[in-house]
Structure formats: C-alpha cells, structure tokens
Design a protein with these regions (language model features):
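Von Willebrand factor
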Residues: 1-77, 81-123, 127-129, 154-164
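C-terminal "exit" segments of structured domains
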Residues: 170, 174-222
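VWA/integrin I-like adhesion module and closely mimicked acidic/polar interface patches used
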Residues: 126-169
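Active-site-proximal beta-strand/loop segments in catalytic clefts of secreted hydrolases
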Residues: 65-68, 123-125, 151-154, 177-179
Length: 222
C-alpha cells in the first residue's frame, strides 16, 4: 500500500547519531487495553522476530512498555534476548482502560536522559488523550533525535491523523499494523530494528533483500 511504502521510505532517511555504544536501544511500547486482546499474541510473536533480523549487524536491546486497566503502566528491564522478552510479553493480560500514550512518551524521555534511545515503536488502536499535548511531546522527542514509529491497528481516522502527526513531529514514520499481512508487517518491524541496531548503512544493505525495507526510505526526516 501507499502508506506502507511511505513508511518504509522514511525509515531509511532517518538520521542516526553514530557513537561507540555497544548496542542500539529500542523502546517497544504497546497498548494492552481490552480492545487489543484478540491480536496481542500474534503481535508479540512478530515483535520477537525483530531480534533475529539484527544478528550480525549490531546488538539490539529492547525494553517493553505497556499500559492497561485503571492507570496501570509497566516497563520491563532492558533485554537482548528474544526468548526472555517474549516470555514477559506472553504473560501480559489485556485489561480495559483508557489510553496512556503520554506516560509512554514521558518514560521514553526519562530513559533517553539516562542512556540514549535510538527509536521508539508504538502499537495501538485508540487515542483518548489530548492530541495537542501528545504532539508536543513528540516534537520534544524529535529535538532529541528519537524518532517515533507509530503503528495503528484498526482504521479510526482521528487516531490515524494523530499518530501520523506524532510520527512526523518526532522525525519518525507511521504505518498501519495489519496482522492480515503478517509478512509485510514483519518487514516493517525488521527495518526499524535494523535501523536501531546498525543505522542507515545497515538498513541500506537490508533493502537489497527486502522490497518493503527498500521502500522505507522516504517518510523519515533527512
């Protein structure tokens, strides 16, 4: 689709600060409210495949964050093992509640102050907060060179508009999170993981074997 193509194109032109850090830190945040229950397990499986994509490129450390229920917010320890992270994710039970995307963005900024984040992935299907405030937070992340990769499950137009604006303001990218096209979705997540672990040069190499990754070069800020 055009949206997927634009997402893939933007990732490849997102600036990554190069340094001597041994690993890329990727914050993986998910909405774990009741509406996501039916797709949670499949989404977890796809997320775990992100680690495999970075083998031989550079190490990737991932922290899982999610919100659910009545003001519940959780963040895991940083993890470089797909098995450990998948075990943690599979133990999460979705509970009804309002979105708390602002808490995820606040947490991300605090983590970045401790040690730099390379990227943030967010998967959700709703927005019950003030979009203007979230866009302001996204803009702050953009100043810090921490791009947001916003994945939307479902097709709510208001949610889509807000997610797109947040991605743009942070210097990141937006894409539908379509579990009916698991292969395509895997390629999208893989491209973000490779970007976080090895930067643009690693992503460029991936484009030679992954058509979706090849398209991930135009949506992000240059």
């Amino acid at each position: 689709s055009t949206e997927v193509s634009q997402f893939l194109e933007k990732v490849a032109i997102t600036p990554v600060q190069q340094d001597a850090e041994p690993e890329g830190r990727l914050l993986f945040a998910m909405d774990a409210t009741a509406s996501r229950e039916t797709t949670w397990d499949r989404a977890c499986h796809l997320q775990g495949q992100m680690f495999q994509a970075t083998e031989g490129i550079g190490s990737l450390a991932v922290q899982l964050c999610y919100y659910r229920g009545f003001s519940e917010f959780h963040s895991s320890a940083w993890c470089s093992s797909a098995k450990i992270l998948l075990r943690e994710m599979s133990g999460v039970k979705c509970l009804g509640g309002h979105t708390q995307i602002n808490r995820i963005l606040d947490h991300a900024m605090k983590e970045h102050k401790t040690k730099r984040l390379k990227a943030i992935v967010f998967v959700g299907d709703a927005l019950e907060e003030t979009a203007d405030h979230l866009c302001h937070q996204a803009g702050q992340l953009g100043v810090l060179n921490v791009p947001l990769f916003m994945f939307q499950e479902g097709s709510n137009p208001k949610v889509k508009s807000a997610y797109q604006q947040m991605a743009q303001l942070s210097g990141g990218a937006y894409s539908p999170f379509n579990l009916q096209s698991a292969g395509e979705l895997k390629d999208l997540l893989t491209a973000v993981a490779v970007f976080a672990a090895g930067g643009k040069s690693a992503l460029k190499k991936l484009t030679t074997i992954s058509p979706p990754a090849a398209l991930l070069t135009q949506q992000l800020k240059g």
